[in-house]
Structures are given as C-alpha cells and as structure tokens.
Amino acid sequence: EVENMSKSNTMESAQLTDAMYYILLSLMIERHGYAIMKYIEELSNQSITMGPGTLYTLLKKLCRAEWILQTSVTADRTKKYQITDTGRQVLLHEVARRKRMVEDGLRILEENGYEG
C-alpha cells in the first residue's frame, strides 16, 4: 500500500506532454485507439493530430504507469481504454498546473500593456 502511494505521488508530480494530456482527456470515457485519435483532433480543432505509432506507444506507457487501463478487447481485436482513478488525479493536477501557467502569462502580458 505504502509503495503504491509513493508511486502515484511521483506520477502526479510528473509533467505530461501535450499528447499524454489529450489522451487522458479523451479517456474520461472508454474509447478505442482510432476514436481517441479522432476525438483529440476534434477537441483541439485539428491543432493536434496523432499518428497510430505515437498513440499506441503512449497508450502502453500510460497503461504501465496505471494512469489508464485496457478495459476490453472486442472480437475483431480492437482494444478499448479508460482513465483510472490515479490517471484522473494526474489529469486534475495537470489541468490546475496549466491553468496557473496561463493565468501567470495573462497577468504579465496585461501588466506590460498587452490586452488578454
């Protein structure tokens, strides 16, 4: 139990790449690989496109970290994934971190005469 706690604390302090961030967001509901790619493109207004190679490498990494879980494999071998409780904590932490960064940026720009 103690070992698992320290592991998740370490994970929470890790900064996510943009790709990992969007994968975690997309897995708030269960999705398969192709649906994840499509959802990320939609969510980011096509500013983030992810190829299958990148996606599946990151899905493996996120599974190993126990931030996501492979939930099922269908008859046609399509794998589905969903975020775990640990992954949700990591995501909440990351959203808060990115929000603070944006707020800092807007404040400094405003102080220097730029309109937000």
How should these model regions be labeled?
Residues Y56-K60:
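Short, hydrophobic-biased segments on the C-terminal half of alpha helices
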Residues A75-V95:
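Basic, amphipathic "hinge/linker" alpha-helix immediately C-terminal to the N-terminal HTH DNA-binding motif
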Residues E1-Q15, R98:
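Intrinsically disordered, low-complexity serine/threonine- and proline-rich regulatory segments
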Residues M11-T54:
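N-terminal helix-turn-helix DNA-binding core of bacterial DNA-binding proteins
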Residues E42, Q46, K61-R64, D104, ...:
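Conserved amphipathic alpha-helical interaction elements at protein-protein interfaces in regulatory
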Residues C63-D76, Q82:
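Beta-hairpin "wing" of winged helix-turn-helix
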Residues N4, L92-G116:
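Amphipathic alpha-helical dimerization/coiled-coil segments
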